[in-house]
Amino acid sequence: MELTQKERELSRWAAEEMEVPLAARPRESTLRRLCLSQGADIWAYIVQHVRSQRNIKKIQGNLLWHAYQDNPKIHRKLELEATVARLRAENQELDQSLELMDQESEAQDVAMTQTLQSLKDTQHRALLLQAQAGAVRRQQRGLQDPMQRLQNQLKHLQDMQRKAKVDVTFGPVVSAAPALEPEVLGDVRAACTLRTQFLQNLLTPRARGGSILSPCDDHVGTSYQQWLTSVETLLTNHPAGHVLAALEYLAAERESEIRSLCYGDGLKEEELSRPQAPESSNSSQVLPSTVHLIQEGWQAVGALVTQRSALLSERQVLTGRLQRLVEEVKRLLLGSSERKVLLLGLRHSGLLAELKALHAQSQELESAVGQRHLLLRELQAKRQRILQWRQLVEDRQEQIRLLIKGNSASKTRLSRGPEEVLALIDQKLVPTSEAVAPQSQELLRCLKEEAKHLPRVLLGPLLPYHVKGLKPLSRILPSIHQLHPTNPRASSLILLSHTLGLPVGKASELLLPRAASLQQDLLFLQDQLGLRRGNLCVKTSLPPGPSTQELLQMQVSQEKEQNENVGQTLKKLSNLLKQALEQIPELQGIVQDWWEQPSQAALPEEICQGLSLPQCQLR
C-alpha cells in the first residue's frame, strides 16, 4: 500500500531534517498510524515548523549575515577592504615589476662587467701581442747578424762543395816541359815556402848561438804571420781534398828531387819505404759516407714499418678475440638479474673511472684558476706600476716643458747681454777714444816740430810711449773653464791669480780685467820713470839756459794738461769698466749655469716650482 502525502513528508522530515539513521526510522505502519490518529495535526505542525539544530544555526547565521550586509558601515568597510586588496595587488605587481627590473639591471650590469672584462682581456692580449711582436722584432734584429754569418758560411760551404766536386789533375812529377799548374798547387807551394822561410829564420839565430834579441826576431814574427795568413787563405779558398792531393803531389815531387840528387852524387840507391798501413786495419777506421748512413737509416725505417704491420695484424686478431669473448659471455649469462648485475658493475666501473678523471680535471682546473688569479694580481700590480710610471713621466714632461721655456728665456737674456755691453762700448768708449786721438796726434806733431829746432836736446822720452806686444782686450770674454788644470792655458792663468793674490777658484772673467788694469798701471809707472830719467839726462848733459827751461816748462804744462785730459778719460773708462765688472758676476753665474747644466732653466737666484737650482740638482 502506497504511503500518503503526510506519511511521505513525515518520513522525509525524519530522514532529511532530523537525520535519523535508517535502523531507527519508524516503519510504514507506524508512520500511517501516526498520521491517522489524533496526533496527525500535531505531526503536520511539527513537520512544518520543527527544524534540526544545524539548520536553525544556518538560518540564524543567514539572518545575521543579511542584517550585517544591510549595515552601511559594513558596506563601507567592505569597499575599503576591496580597495586595500586591489592596492595590495597593484603593489605586489609593482614589486614584481621592480624585481624584474632589478634582475634586468643586474643582468645588464653582469653583461657590462663581462664586456668590460672582455675589453680588458682584449687590451691585455693586444698589449701582450705588441710586447711579443716587439720581442720578436728584437729577436729578428738580433738574429739578422747570425743569419747573415750563417748565409755567408753556407755560401762558402756550397762553393767549397762545388769546388770539391771538381777533380784537380796534376801533371807528371818529373816533366821536362813546364806545364800550367793548378791554383791550389801554387797556393800550397807558396805556403810551404813561407813555412820553410819561417823555420830558417827561427833556427838560424839558434844555430849561431846568439841569445840577444835582434831585429831578426821581428822578421821571424813577420814570416810567421805571413805563413799563418797563407794557410788560412788556402783552407778558406780550397777544399781539403784538393789541398791533400796537392801536398801528396809536392811530397812526390820532393821525393823525386831527392832521388835525383842522390843519383847525381853517386850514392847508393836506397829504397824509401813508406809506411803503408794495412787495408785491414784502416778499413775499420774509415768513416762511412753520407749515402751509406742514409741507406742504413732507410733500412731501419723499413724494418720498423714491417714490425708495425705485424703489430697491427696482431692487434686486429686480439680485438676480434675480445669481441668473441664478450659475445660468449653475453650468451652464457642467460639470467636477467646476473646480466643486470654485470651491466651495473661495468657501469659502476665506468662511472668510477669517469669520476676519477673529472676529479683530476677539476684539480687541474683549480690549479689553473689559482695560477690565473696569481697572474691577474701580477698584471694588476704591473698595470698600477705602469699607471704610476705614466703619471711620473707626464709630470717629468711637464717639468721639462717648463724648463725648456725658462731655458729659451735665459738664452734670450744671454743673447741680449753681450749686445748691450757692445752697444755701451760703442756709445761711450769709442767716441771718447776718437775725441782723444786727434789731440794726441796734434801734441805729437807739435813735439816733433819743436824738436827740429833743438837738435841737441833728447826729446825721445817726451814722445808717447808705445808698448810693443800690447794687444787690445778681446770683445769676447774668455770661458770660465780655462782655469781647469787640464786646459793648456790654465797654468798661466793660475800663476797670474797667485801673483795677484786672488783665490784659485776666481773666474778668468774677473782675473783678466784686474791683470790688465795692473799692467796698465805698470806701464804708466814705467813711462813716468823713463820720463824722469830723460829729464835727469837732459839736465845733466845740457848747460842750463832759459830757453830750454821755458821749453821744458811749456812741455810740462802741456803734459799736465794732457795728463788731466787722459786722467778724465781714464776715469770715465774706469767707471764704465767698473759697471761692466759689476755685471760680470751675474753674467758669470748665467754662463756657468748655462754651460754646466744646459738642460736646466732655473738660475741660482731664480725659483722654479718652489725650488732653486741646487735643490733641483739634489732632488
UniProtKB/Swiss-Prot annotation:
Localization (cell): Cytoplasm, Cytoskeleton, Microtubule organizing center, Centrosome; Cytoplasm, Cytoskeleton, Spindle
Keywords on record: Acetylation, Cell cycle, Cell division, Coiled coil, Cytoplasm, Cytoskeleton, Microtubule, Mitosis
PTM annotation (N-acetylmethionine): residues: M1
A Pfam family that the UniProt record links to this protein: HAUS5
Main localization of the protein described in the UniProt heading: cytoplasm
GO biological process: cell division; centrosome cycle; spindle assembly
Coiled-coil portions: 73-108, 310-395, 550-590
Gene Ontology cellular component annotations, sorted alphabetically: centrosome; cytoplasm; HAUS complex; mitotic spindle microtubule
Similarity-based family: Belongs to the HAUS5 family.
Oligomeric form and interacting partners: Component of the HAUS augmin-like complex. The complex interacts with the gamma-tubulin ring complex and this interaction is required for spindle assembly. Interacts with EML3 (phosphorylated at 'Thr-882').
Role summary: Contributes to mitotic spindle assembly, maintenance of centrosome integrity and completion of cytokinesis as part of the HAUS augmin-like complex.
Protein name per UniProt: HAUS augmin-like complex subunit 5
Source organism of the structure: Mus musculus (Mouse)
